[in-house]
Regions:
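Short, small-residue-biased leader/transition segments that mark boundaries at the very start
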Residues: 2-7, 178
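Catalytic cores of large soluble enzymes that bind and process phosphate-bearing ligands
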Residues: 6-11, 136, 140
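PRPP/pyrophosphate-binding module of the type I phosphoribosyltransferase fold
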Residues: 11, 15-132
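Amphipathic, soluble alpha/beta structural segments
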Residues: 35-41, 170-177
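Acidic, metal-coordinating catalytic segment for phosphate/diphosphate chemistry
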Residues: 100-173
Length: 178
């Protein structure tokens, strides 16, 4: 199997570095280059997503961000990685809002741009999202219950907050689901 790399959009680099180190992977980054001379819809428009990293050719990629709002930036990054001949692309995010619906993700999946999207159930997930072939729900209920129970017993939650083994297990599941 080809090696995987962790690729991150700008922001939250500490989390991406941690995950890359836990998984023993290389890491790269896309950052947004904006036009600060004008404002469109209350924001400075993105001119380009610039890439910092090594060759991704033939490698499986993990794109990490804290949340998927519309998802456009993550899908643009996925498309840019595919243009650079990346193999499979997995999108990891804590919160999947999908504010503009699921159509763009459906199309990206159908076009081979993304392979899987993983988010947690720490916010509401629509039944439509849960039925998507490309979607994996990361159920955090057990861990929230552990945290509440541990705090209720005045114990330390540090062992619960160390996700190394759980991260390894999820990645193994991704590779065995093919």
């Amino acid at each position: 199997s080809a090696a995987s790399d962790v690729y991150k959009r700008q922001g939250g680099m500490g989390r991406a570095i941690y995950i890359a180190n836990v998984l023993g992977l290389d890491m790269g980054m896309f950052y947004k280059r904006r036009d600060y001379t004008r404002i469109v819809n209350g924001r400075n428009p993105i001119v380009a997503h610039e890439f910092l990293g090594t060759s991704v050719e033939g490698k499986d990629m993990i794109i990490i961000d804290d949340m998927i709002s519309s998802g456009e930036s993550m899908l643009e990054v996925a498309a840019a990685l595919k243009e650079r001949k990346a193999n499979k692309i997995f999108v990891f995010s804590t919160f999947g809002l999908f504010t503009n619906g699921l159509d763009k993700f459906d199309k990206a999946y159908e076009n081979g741009i993304i392979d899987k999207v993983l988010t947690t159930n720490l916010i509401y997930q629509t039944p439509e999202l849960l039925q998507r072939e490309w979607y994996i729900n990361c159920d955090m209920s057990k861990y929230i219950a552990y945290i509440i129970d541990t705090l209720n017993h005045d114990s330390s939650i540090s062992d619960l907050l160390n996700p190394n083994e759980r991260i390894q297990n999820i990645v193994c599941l991704l590779y065995t689901s093919d």
